[in-house]
Curated annotation (Swiss-Prot):
Protein name (Swiss-Prot/TrEMBL): Glycine receptor subunit alpha-2
GO cellular component: cell projection; chloride channel complex; GABA-ergic synapse; glycinergic synapse; intracellular membrane-bounded organelle; plasma membrane; postsynaptic specialization membrane
Superkingdom of origin organism: Eukaryota
Source organism (scientific name): Homo sapiens
Family: Belongs to the ligand-gated ion channel (TC 1.A.9) family. Glycine receptor (TC 1.A.9.3) subfamily. GLRA2 sub-subfamily.
Subcellular compartments: Postsynaptic cell membrane; Synapse; Cell membrane; Cell projection
Site (described: Important for obstruction of the ion pore in the closed conformation): 295
Glycosylated residue positions: 72, 103
S-S bridge residues: 172-186, 232-243
């Protein structure tokens, strides 16, 4: 009885398995006929391998639209810091986010639910990238603290966003004729290195191509809000290459130079005028003051040129320093003239004494030749008829000179008059120079620069 029961249960179990297998096969056949596929969800790793891995067929060495129209790459930059504008080397340093966007249809996807993928920077080696470089770059640094400062984002439609943080040292040829009241224009040029315009074209992003961090300030310059965007297509022997540029206008703030150069030199010039009020007999004081101001002005002039390049043209600060040195030197020469005039009375009296001595010698000589007093005839001249007449002097003796004190007073008054005139003439001349100087450089030339 038990044996029969076991056989019955075994037969029922086999029937159940056969029925279940038939049902599964029927469902698969029905699904295949109706076109339905079993649902499968790819893992992120499998999806990336399928999108740009070895099995995807994607080749990073070939640009999008190969043998077709050029790839349009839109660029924009965000300026984090702007500074270290150096006149001696004529360059500036800037820290930026460089963002490039282009479309690569080979990276379009629909199997993954997200609209965009933010990928690790290491994936940059697996995709094609534009060969952008900065044409006027003198030095550059990447940033990798705490990790590589790079961003890679791929959208469903194949749009690629590549962002990178850079610190650049860019050349900036400067015109220093109006220094330190100048406005400099510094450029940043983005160019393709290997792809010609048949393969690659750079364009500025239409919305916010150049952005500046809020509150960005420079030590000596004001960064103007107006930024000129344009194209700078380069023509070489190897072809025509795409290039875009942005021009930054930097207006120098002259507060530093006003305190360090203009005001000290102005005070030195005014100090040199103090000698006009010092007594002309105090030669050591006036000479020491004059020489000290000249040497100080020379040192000040040399210091103003220490931080500037050796250019062939004259700068505004050079004219100021040269004129200040000229006024200080003229004040020293003024005392030399005063001292010379005040001592002229001694030379005048010496010449008068010499003239008087010569006249006396001539009289003595004349008397020795025609003196007949020994014969009782006195000063006589012999004429043809043998008679003698009394001789009269040919040149009468000069009038006695004026009193020496009066002559001295006359020349001293002349010297004092020079000091008196200088007290008004020097400040007036310097004031006129200042009017012309500041009008020329601060108003006229400043407006000309802005028009350009």
């Amino acid at each position: 009885m038990n044996r029969q029961l076991v056989n019955i249960l075994t037969a029922l179990f086999a029937f159940f398995l056969e029925t279940n297998h038939f049902r599964t096969a029927f469902c698969k056949d029905h699904d295949s006929r109706s076109g339905k596929q079993p649902s499968q969800t790819l893992s992120p790793s499998d999806f990336l391998d399928k999108l740009m891995g070895r099995t995807s067929g994607y080749d990073a060495r070939i640009r999008p639209n190969f043998k077709g129209p050029p790839v349009n790459v839109t660029c924009n930059i965000f300026i984090n810091s702007f500074g270290s504008v150096t006149e001696t080397t004529m360059d500036y340093r800037v820290n930026i986010f460089l963002r490039q966007q282009w479309n690569d249809s080979r990276l379009a996807y629909s199997e993954y639910p997200d609209d965009s993928l933010d990928l690790d920077p290491s994936m940059l080696d697996s995709i094609w990238k534009p060969d952008l470089f900065f044409a006027n770059e003198k030095g550059a640094n990447f940033h990798d603290v705490t990790t590589d400062n790079k961003l890679l984002r791929i959208s469903k439609n194949g749009k690629v966003l590549y962002s990178i943080r850079l610190t650049l040292t860019l050349s900036c040829p400067m015109d220093l004729k109006n220094f330190p009241m100048d406005v400099q224009t510094c450029t940043m040029q983005l160019e393709s290195f290997g792809y010609t315009m048949n393969d690659l074209i750079f364009e500025w992003l239409s919305d916010g191509p150049v952005q500046v961090a809020e509150g960005l300030t420079l030590p000596q310059f004001i960064l103007k809000e107006e930024k000129e965007l344009g194209y700078c297509t380069k023509h070489y022997n190897t072809g025509k290459f795409t290039c875009i540029e942005v021009k930054f206008h930097l207006e120098r703030q002259m507060g530093y130079y006003l305190i360090q150069m203009y005001i000290p030199s102005l005070l030195i010039v005014i100090l040199s005028w103090v000698s006009f009020w010092i007594n002309m007999d105090a030669a050591p004081a006036r000479v020491a003051l004059g020489i000290t101001t000249v040497l100080t002005m020379t040192t000040q002039s040399s210091g103003s040129r220490a931080s500037l390049p050796k250019v062939s043209y004259v700068k505004a600060i050079d004219i100021w320093m040269a004129v200040c040195l000229l006024f200080v030197f003229a004040a020293l020469l003024e005392y030399a003239a005063v001292n010379f005039v005040s001592r002229q009375h001694k030379e005048f009296l010496r010449l008068r004494r010499r003239q008087k001595r010569q006249n006396k010698e001539e009289d003595v000589t004349r008397e020795s030749r025609f003196n007949f007093s020994g014969y009782g005839m006195g000063h006589c001249l012999q004429v043809k008829d043998g008679t003698a007449v009394k001789a009269t002097p040919a040149n009468p003796l000069p009038q006695p000179p004026k009193d020496g004190d009066a002559i001295k007073k006359k020349f001293v008054d002349r010297a004092k008059r020079i000091d008196t005139i200088s007290r008004a003439a020097f400040p007036l001349a310097f004031l006129i120079f200042n009017i012309f100087y500041w009008i020329t450089y601060k108003i006229i030339r400043h407006e000309d620069v802005h028009k350009k």
